[in-house]
Amino acid sequence: MMQFELRIAYTLLMLTTRAATLDDADLITRHRKAMFADADSAPPPVLDEMARHFEPWVRRMIAEGKYVGWIISDADRDIASAGLLILDWAPHFLDSTGEQRGYILNVFVEPEYRRRGLAQALTNECMDEARRRGIRVVALHASNKGQPVYEKLGFTTSNEMLYVDRRTP
């Protein structure tokens, strides 16, 4: 567990960072849902449905060691979280010997704690974990608000495209 002090406008916060566990699946799910709601990504019923499927998925990924997450707490309140998904990946010209890629997801900070460097701290935790595992390529999808944070950390815009099959099964 890591503790650090953050001084903002004469306010001292005693924050604690810890690794996410299976017990945090509900919190991670709530933060993910709030992250998408903040970005107006989808209507509430769609986010509810996503959350219903996400929680058992993230439990499984944590149990299998494929999702490594961190939680920041202020006293007894969990205020921020993020995760690193470990993906099997084909060797690529960006990393010709690597067989894994990292994907940072669920970076969320409660509104009253934003603009204090917490998203950056969580992203750094994810990047450090990727380095410990020898993962050299890490991707993420950034909101408009988050993009400057990630660019400051060295992320660049890529040419990745996305296709979503919207036909009903």
List each language-model region with its residue ranges:
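Conserved acetyl-CoA pyrophosphate-binding loop and the N-cap/start of the following alpha-helix
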Residues: 113, 117-125
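A short helix-loop-beta-strand connector motif used in the catalytic cores of GNAT acetyltransferases and
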Residues: 56-71, 103
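A short beta-loop-alpha structural element at the N-terminal edge
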Residues: 16-30
